[in-house]
């Protein structure tokens, strides 16, 4: 099956990347380490640095979009410096010399010393003007690193939650490149619980309900219209899909070690 990405999920925001095959109970599953190109009227930002195995595909997709007339790529943003989210930053900085990287970048000046002058901090409430919209660093409610920052596009009201809203999908059922609402056969609670156990292990040792309540409050405060996660399918109908996500987070927090997997 050809790669269905890139896909324009709302006007001016493009979903880039390709699937990663994983195994679950002996069956093949697919997951994403997604990257998003956020275009304003004057310039664009790349959200997430990309996983190493995806970089060739991401670069080809990005070059094609820029050649089509998407405003110049000027900014890079990573939610946190874990490999699937930031490993490609050095390569992107090299390939696009007019860009600057933003985030809580910790020791990346040691990883990419040749680009240390192009690494910038990006704390909660900081924003970047892309022309006609701003990209804002917001609270990261569900995360695997304490310094994670989520991103938010103010004009299109799109939330970029990194490891939040993470779940796998079924390749054989045609879910690749789909919105969550288009993946009719997907067991979203189970796939959310699976990802929580593997990537958000701490959720099994806490009462998850305060986090769920804070997540709901943040979505209301920002008036989020679409969610673009790094490791899940985009969510276009929050009212229809979020109950399954909440159920999956609660299910994952109740599971004992190894149960169900």
Language model features with spans:
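Metallo-beta-lactamase
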Residues: 8, 94-229, 233-237, ...
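Short, glycine/acidic-enriched loop or turn micro-motifs at the edges of active sites
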Residues: 51-52, 83, 166, 234
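Active-site metal-binding motif and surrounding structural segment of the metallo-beta-lactamase
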Residues: 54-101
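Short beta->alpha connector loops
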Residues: 20-21, 81-84, 140-144, 209-210
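Binuclear metal-ion centers of metallo-dependent hydrolases, dominated by the metallo-beta-lactamase
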Residues: 225-261
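Active-site neighborhood of phospho(di)ester-bond hydrolases with catalytic His/Asp-centered motifs
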Residues: 47-49, 72-81, 101-105, 159-163, ...
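Conserved beta-strand hairpin/beta-sheet module of binuclear metal-dependent hydrolase folds
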Residues: 4-63, 150-153, 157-161
């Amino acid at each position: 099956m050809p790669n269905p990405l890139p896909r324009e999920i709302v006007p001016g925001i493009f979903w880039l990347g390709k699937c990663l095959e994983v195994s679950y109970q002996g069956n093949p599953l697919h997951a994403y380490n997604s990257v998003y190109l956020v275009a304003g009227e004057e310039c664009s930002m790349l959200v997430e640095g990309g996983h190493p195995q995806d970089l060739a595909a991401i670069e080809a997709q990005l070059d094609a979009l820029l050649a089509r007339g998407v405003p110049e790529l000027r900014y890079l943003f990573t939610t946190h410096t874990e490999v699937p989210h930031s490993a490609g930053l050095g390569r992107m900085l090299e390939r696009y010399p007019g860009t600057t990287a933003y985030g809580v970048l910790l020791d990346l000046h040691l990883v990419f010393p040749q680009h240390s002058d192009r690494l910038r901090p990006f704390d909660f409430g900081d924003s970047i003007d892309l022309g006609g919209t701003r990209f804002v660093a917001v609270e990261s409610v569900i995360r695997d690193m304490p310094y994670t920052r989520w991103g938010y596009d103010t004009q299109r009201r799109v939330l970029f939650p990194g490891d939040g809203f993470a779940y796998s999908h079924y390749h054989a059922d045609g879910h690749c490149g789909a919105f969550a609402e288009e993946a009719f056969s997907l067991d979203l609670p189970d796939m959310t619980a699976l990802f929580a156990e593997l990537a958000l292990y701490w959720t099994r040792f806490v009462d998850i309900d305060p986090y769920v309540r804070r997540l709901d409050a943040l979505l209301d405060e920002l008036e989020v219209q679409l969610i673009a996660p790094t490791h899940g399918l985009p969510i276009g109908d929050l009212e229809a899909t979020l109950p399954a996500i909440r159920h999956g987070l609660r299910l994952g927090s109740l599971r004992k070690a190894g149960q169900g997997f």
